[in-house]
Regions:
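Short connector loops at secondary-structure junctions
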Residues: 22-28, 60-63, 168, 172-178
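Charged (often Lys/Glu-rich) extended helix/loop segments that serve as interaction or gating elements
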Residues: 97-244
Length: 244
């Protein structure tokens, strides 16, 4: 990337070599705050303004999608109206209608997939410690918690459908890595944040939601010689298809 304060230097290089800049790409993150989006659009259009040949602005990063109940999903109508006014004002001022590009991948597919694992082991470090659930899954399918403390919804599916009391657990993966923790503190992969779940037992199925984006594609597949997990698509008619 290029720091925005270096725009004048870039313009000099463009002029020196007779180049034309057709597209400006800025990375604004994946937030849901309309005010942040508006500020990012304004700053990005200021860059476009400096390159007369530019006709496309790509706001990289995409839309925030809430995976957890306390997370806010981007309101496309709210941010869209503000962005529209900024682009229209730019067109009136410069005579240039700018094409907007946004990367919507996560927004579309994040909550379309889930990991279905099995509880392999249970252990405890005593009254002053934690109760642990160990799965036959982990970094090999989802590195987001280990990398940046990402949060995912989780559920225990008791065998035989029985009802059990809730209990607080630290959920761990099966990799030989101290960082293979699936319940880190939010935004802190080094921290631990117990999750309240139905009481687990060895052999129970365990679901991890919100895994449709940046999980399979970003995972440590085949690490520790664990084979790559199959990916199954449930079609609209209920039929199952093995994708991978």
């Amino acid at each position: 990337g290029i720091w925005y304060k270096d725009a004048d230097e870039v313009k000099g290089i463009v002029e020196e070599y007779g180049l034309t800049v057709f597209r400006i790409h800025t990375h604004i993150g994946s937030g849901s705050d309309p005010e942040i989006w508006l500020k990012a659009v304004s700053l990005s259009l200021n860059l476009v303004r400096q390159f007369e040949g530019a006709r496309t602005l790509n706001l990289g990063g995409g839309y925030k999608v809430g995976r957890m109940e306390n997370e806010t999903t981007t309101d496309l109508q709210e941010i869209g109206e503000s962005m529209k006014m900024e682009f229209e004002a730019f067109a009136t001022e410069t005579g240039r209608e700018i094409r907007l590009e946004v990367e919507p991948g996560t927004y579309l597919v994040a909550n379309c997939c889930a990991i279905l694992a099995t509880i392999q082991d249970m252990t405890s470090t005593g009254e002053s410690g934690y109760d642990f659930i160990k799965l036959d899954s982990g970094m090999t399918e989802n590195t987001r918690p280990s990398m940046y403390g990402a949060q995912h919804p989780m559920v225990v599916f008791p065998q035989n459908g029985e009802t059990r009391a809730d209990k607080d657990y630290i959920v761990t993966g099966h990799c030989c890595e101290s960082g293979d923790i699936l319940t880190p503190a939010p935004g802190d992969p080094e921290g631990l944040a117990p999750r309240t779940l139905s009481e687990g037992k060895i052999g129970d199925l365990f679901g991890i939601g919100g895994t449709g984006a940046y999980c399979s594609s970003m995972s440590a597949k085949n690490y520790n010689s664990f084979p790559e997990s199959p990916e199954i698509m449930i079609r609209l008619d209920g039929q199952l298809s093995v994708m991978r």
